[in-house]
Amino acid sequence: MDIQQQTRGFRYFYISVWRFILHLKARLIDDQINIRAGHLAYVTLLSLVPMIAVTMSMLSAFPVFKGIRVNIESLVYSYFLPAAGDSAQVYINEFVNNASKGTFVGIIALLVVAILLISAIDKALNNIWRTTEKRSLVVSFSMYWMVLTLGPVLMGSSLVATSYVVSLELFSQSELSGLLPWLVERLPMLFSVASILLLYMVVPTQKVRFFHALLGAVVAALLFEAGKRAFAYYVTQFPSYEAIYGALATIPILFVWVYLSWMIVLVGAEITAALPEYLDDPFEKDGTKATTALTENKEVDESEPNQGNDTIA
């Protein structure tokens, strides 16, 4: 009896997972995330230099963050621009330095362009959650401004805290000496999960369950890590872009990677938004209904040939 119950439980689990995959597939097609990812990639490339300029300006305002600017740059370029980070870093740093020397009107223009990216992310995620409630202009501007001002500060604080923790004598002991490289190696992954989790929890105007957002963030972070490795391998082993575009190869490589990154983020958002729809479905709440329906359909399919034979006889 226990074996039968376990078999039935595993069977229902696989059926539920398969039904959720079908539900997620229909959602991905309906939301046209490839088009949304393309729009976000375009806005991101337009806003990339202003966002980095604003971030570095915010970090420069706090003396405690002066020594970690290089660490933040290396983290961003190595993690978010795989294989194209070296050449892209030179161009982007030059653009940022030129932008930081602008006038007051130019700085305001940079802020407006940076806010455009946050606004595009806001609209894309709320469309995925099918939310009809809209934030007021004051609330939206306050949230965007908070992201621009507090985001770099939180990023810098996390790096400072991490540097302090790993420098403690506790990690220099022989028992924990092997733990330090393991933690440092997984910091980008944890940073990615935390960032995507915060994105899924804060941006939608409706309430998002923490476990659903965490699951979507973990899946997106894993896909992001796998995509980063696969994309870096493709760029290094099959340098077709460099053969075609030459010195301008950084531009299409950067655009393709930004597009893939937004595809991954939107897939994680679709998983997060689809989970409550699927789990709150009355048909899925009863664990026996899915299995019963499948069994009934199978019995009907098996009985149809027999009925046909009886009719012929």
From Swiss-Prot:
Keyword Cell membrane applies: yes
Task: Write down the species.
Answer: Shewanella denitrificans (strain OS217 / ATCC BAA-1090 / DSM 15013)
Give the location in the cell: Cell inner membrane
Q: What NCBIfam families does the record point to?
A: PRK01637.1, yihY_not_rbn
Q: What is this protein called?
A: UPF0761 membrane protein Sden_3448
Name the InterPro entries for this protein. UPF0761_bac, Virul_fac_BrkB
Family as reported in the entry's similarity comment: Belongs to the UPF0761 family.
- What cellular component GO annotations does this protein have? plasma membrane
Residue segments, region Disordered: 290-313
Keywords assigned by UniProt, alphabetized: Cell inner membrane, Cell membrane, Membrane, Transmembrane, Transmembrane helix
